[in-house]
Amino acid sequence: RLKPESFAINIEAFGELAPLESTRLAAQVSGEVVEWNPKFVAGGIVKRGETLFSIEKDAYTAAPLQAESALANAQAALIEEKALANVAEREAATLPNSRVTDLYLRKPQILSAEAAVKAAQAQMKIAKRDLDNTEVVAPYDALIVSRSIGKGDFLTVGTTAATLYNVEVGEVTFPLARFDQAFLPEALDGIDATVSLLNGTTDEIKRSATIVRDSGIYDSATRMTHLVARINDPYGLTTQQPVLRFGAYTKVSFTGKTIDNVYRIPQELITRRQLWILDDADKLVAKPVEVVREVGSEFLIRVDIAADDRIVMTLPEYPQNGMAVKVIEGAEKLVAKQP
């Protein structure tokens, strides 16, 4: 006898782990490479803000000093103009209004001096930025994929120095078959998932992940949509979790919809989308079933049966609807044979 139940659908799919972002790191100032980090090699891992290489900075050390001097001169000129304007304003009080102009009150001169101060401040920021940019740092915790420079190389602005992968976050983009799409939750963002990698032994590496989005389109060839699962710190730098490397082929599993009033039944009991039961007269009755989903060796089905209906576990060779059968007493399973 079977009882209907609620069943949470587990969805599994496969995809490749990739970085959330990659960067072609380029020089922002020109100059000679004078030093580089020993970890700045293909396969090296560096922390956010860690210096990767240094550009000769003599020319850039002087620029902030020159900009500071120019700023001081501009500020002094502004102070002088304001003082002259105050004198002019006092003198204007003794003059007819027709003779008091903006030029007499030195308003244009003050505007010009204020603009000069702002320009000097901007030049100071640029000079300091250029000096800072002689130390090229990692924009995030990164895996060095490739490096194309060495000590003594002269770089121009925009020269690509390396390719980096962000190891703070990884993503698995995986296709979802059409038969799974019907069991997706209403809202996908934030669903907990598990990303696992079979490492070739009996051990399975598993990491927690989150479904963050879908691709928004269907693949024109397969008619599949794609979802994206995100893993924080896939290389385990801060969490000390098992390492999942970029390029690894992984399995993503998560819980989909919960379906109600379904029966779990071994697949071998369903023939031609029918389930066989016995009526009160020990006659075979075929009940049409709706197969909702296949789960391992079982089907989840919907079928119109009563709680006390007897399910036939073993059928005669050629069962017919209404066929009278003999029930074997004491069998562990309900076996029906032709009399």
Which residue stretches match the model-derived regions?
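Acidic, gly/proline-rich low-complexity N-terminal segments at the extreme N terminus
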Residues: 1-18, 118, 182-205, 331-339
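Long, amphipathic coiled-coil "stalk"/hairpin helices in large membrane-associated assemblies
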Residues: 3-70, 139, 145-150, 173, ...
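Extended amphipathic alpha-helical segments
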Residues: 9-12, 69, 73-77, 81, ...
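Short beta-strand-turn/beta-hairpin segments enriched in glycine/proline and small hydrophobics
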Residues: 9-35, 122-139, 164-166, 213-216, ...
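Beta-strand/loop subdomains of soluble extracytoplasmic proteins
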Residues: 10, 169, 176-227, 271-274
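Surface-exposed patches in structured soluble domains
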Residues: 16, 45-48, 130, 137-182, ...
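Structural microfeature recognizing short secondary-structure transition sites
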Residues: 204-260, 267
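Edge-of-domain interaction segments
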Residues: 240-286, 290-339
